[in-house]
Amino acid sequence: MHLRNIAVGLSAFFLLATGAHARGVMDLYSSQEQRLSFDACADIFPASTPINTATVPASMKPLALCSDHFAVVYSQTSKTPLVVVERLNARQLNAAKGEERTNHFYADPRLPKGGRAELSDYHGQQPAMDRGHQSPAADAPDAKAMAQSFALSNMVPQDPTNNRKIWSKVEADVRKFAVRAGGDVYVFTGPLFDPGHSTIGDNQVWVPTRLFKLVYDASSQRAWAYVLPNAETRIQKPMDYDTFVKSTGLKLLGNLPVSGSVGRS
């Protein structure tokens, strides 16, 4: 009898703690950011023109998510972001240098259960998969932005070596470029799912076969991109925008002017 009472008490405490955590995580987002639209973050996109989620196949069940410093086109089918957009500049990245990484990952409370990844999906996987940031934690200029970057809606299952070495180098190169660019640089990052891709976890989170990062310098109208396997690989020479579109089928810059490319810095 006493053991049962203890068990019931612990269960109630767990439920209360879980509810408090969910409320606390939701507090990271403004009322506008909780509305699942790009109204609160249109200025993160080039020319303040967000990606139209209606252009995403309906089978992917897309949603629009705003955070303070990045925007996400999210799929309830893959349980991953499809595209994450950032607007980077020297001021933001210089502020980010002093921000401490938290490593507090969490399921995005704005998303319906069954349409999102859970922490348990990444546990005990063979082969192991990292929770790979699409908007890097190192880009976050303040504590709130850092916390938001650890939402699973900003993650894809990523090969550990790729995440910690190859992709980390790509991210660092983009930051160096953005600091020197003298204006706003827009970065589009996301997964590519080729036929035969695998899944992880009870929620069947899709594992990308490739990853992309497209950089657009609004001042010079130059664009360049990486498209790399989600595996231990080497950094390849960046491609121009036309090659990126042909490789991925993604015309992410719409009708924005693109006048050239640029290599790694």
Per-region residue spans from a language model:
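Domain-level detector for secreted/extracellular nuclease and nuclease-toxin modules, and
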Residues: 4-5, 13-265
